[in-house]
Amino acid sequence: FSVLPNSRGWLAGRVTLDDNQYLYDNSRRFTLHVPEQRNILLVNGSGVDGAYLRLGLSTELSSSSARFNLEEVSETALSASVLGQFDAVVLNGVTTLSSGERAAVTAYVNGGGGLLIFPGDDMQLDDFNGLLSDLGAGRITGISAGSASGQSVGVFDRVDTDHTLFEGMFESDLSGRTPQLEQPVFFRMMNYVPAQGAEQTIISLTGDVPFLQEIRSGQGSVLMFGVEAGVRWSDLPVRGLFVPLLYRSLYYLSATASVSGESMLTGSGMQLRLAGVPGATRITIRDEAGQEFVPEQRTVLGAVVAELTGSFFIPGTYDVLVNNDVVRRIVVHPDPAESNLAL
């Protein structure tokens, strides 16, 4: 089953089973974080305009269920960008990727970041294939073009409508027929050959040519389109499909990092790292009854580490407060050994 949260921020909940012989382990608490907004870095290639992407992510066209804070830079600024500050990164027609930039992007994805790639006219295939190799993915072999002006190089053939990307996008068809996507006209298409690793083709064209490919690497994910985000390669950006597909792609990618709060067992301890918190800041832990506990804390590079241990922590949900603001929610679970009635 699935549940859609109706608010943002740090949320707490529980899953409960029917009563049985031992009642105290029939519920399992959890916490999750639904961000107020998702920070997106849009990196435009030299001479590439991100107008269609900006328009597609504008508040006037996108749903209110998620808010995107878009920061736009040219590809020359990629090496100086701190990727970890963003929930997803878009490479829009980027031409070249240095070895340092490839290493930074790979580390970002492996650490849980989301990457969206649109090809471009002048992209250096060796640079992008180097990045794809680092991510354990396949290879770009070239660009296909139609044999005549205005002739499409292919049409949508197979669509994985069961993918999370399309959740709730199509109405149920009682006849069992597969929903059909609007068919854009493709003038040019990037040719991509998948590897045998953790990747899947979400949308393919006739001839089994990937149009939208997902690549999993480490804790993160990459979505790669077969066309650029303008109207030179296709008319996709002026089709009704473009905005929901772009929106859902970034929503999906920006959620690839873990959104669950930390947890520990009763009687154990935990070192909780809070990034970006000044060393002199007082951290407070508050339980469900409103009682507060001030843990020992120490300053490390770029963060504060709080030592959570002691008799204060019994099964339940706890708020972590910095200057009276909830910055984290954690769960203390009962020891599983307590559920073993044979002991």
Per-region residue spans from a language model:
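N-linked glycosylation sequons
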Residues: 1-343
